[in-house]
Amino acid sequence: MSEDQKSENSVPSKVNMVNRTDILTTIKSLSWLDLMLPFTIILSIIIAVIISVYVPSSRHTFDAEGHPNLMGVSIPLTVGMIVMMIPPICKVSWESIHKYFYRSYIRKQLALSLFLNWVIGPLLMTALAWMALFDYKEYRQGIIMIGVARCIAMVLIWNQIAGGDNDLCVVLVITNSLLQMVLYAPLQIFYCYVISHDHLNTSNRVLFEEVAKSVGVFLGIPLGIGIIIRLGSLTIAGKSNYEKYILRFISPWAMIGFHYTLFVIFISRGYQFIHEIGSAILCFVPLVLYFFIAWFLTFALMRYLSISRSDTQRECSCDQELLLKRVWGRKSCEASFSITMTQCFTMASNNFELSLAIAISLYGNNSKQAIAATFGPLLEVPILLILAIVARILKPYYIWNNRN
């Protein structure tokens, strides 16, 4: 057997060994709290539903009617909704945003990401929601609202695990955070009512004002608090102490606030949820399809956009091709793995905290829209963990441009 054949035959075994190691590394990259998140969400829902069914007096404890409220949401629930959004915002490097825009590749990737996140993403989720929930208007609206809410912070975790470009990811997260203040209201009305031809109980102008106010309160308040906490803490304590002590204290409150919010919702709605569990579970279909389609569509697009259009350069001639015989993508070897991963996970992720907060504010904590919005994080964490593992598995099978 020739040396080339020996080298070629050794590639699969090496790749398989790398894959097994990468899978374990990917899983270990998450904290045990992150890994337990799907189970703790399910446990919170089960306990709340049991309380709702067997303690009927609990169902109206958190209703806005007859209690102090903000934007139609009871104060106890409002506190939970705001608390769960502050920690992700505190993790974003707001103080460094001006440095990144000087890099030409970031400006180019930002334009592509805006198109994927604000045009393709909501369209894809709307199409999938209609496909699976054609006869379930309220659940469909809740799923569409998840699609309109683009991810602002959780993607930082997935990007780091998959080996994405951290600088690019920070720019995309900050840009999406600011754009959501402006775009969420018109897009929610457009996809939930205008193109869906769903009946409006009020005028377009009044509905727009309600959605815009809800976004201003339930994104604006935590956004402002999060930025003040980060910038103030960095000034007083320094970056090292902030990340070592302050951020470590703040981070768990995102999931504490989220689980508390889930608990309240299912106490209010749990008894009805049991009777409609079949139609509610249908919400899983568009969400699961969205995560996988969005991720692999972006992966394929990033490879396609890197294909050389020159007649004289049809295939890769870099050193990697000489070393790896059995690889794919020789014509698209200009693709960067780190940039591709950042685009894939930014496209596949959603801001489930915002969609849940707005659903509660607009339709009430006992609405089907709010129930549908709770399924986002239940599915997003395990599926994106799977996709992070898939990214590690796919990497050795493709040639990548590592110059960045």
UniProtKB/Swiss-Prot annotation:
Glycans are attached at N201, N365. Changing S349A: Impairs arsenite resistance. Changing R230A: Leads to ER retention, protein unstability and arsenite sensitivity. Keywords: Antiport, Arsenical resistance, Cell membrane, Glycoprotein, Ion transport, Membrane, Transmembrane, Transmembrane helix, Transport. GO terms for molecular function: antimonite transmembrane transporter activity; antiporter activity; arsenite transmembrane transporter activity. Heterologous expression endows plants with greater arsenic resistance by enhancing arsenite efflux. Reduces arsenic accumulation in rice grains. Does not lower significantly arsenic tissue levels in Arabidopsis. It comes from the Eukaryota. The chain crosses the membrane at residues 35-55, 70-90, 114-134, 142-162, 170-190, 217-237, 246-266, 281-301, 344-364, 370-390. Changing F352A: Impairs arsenite resistance. This is Arsenical-resistance protein 3.
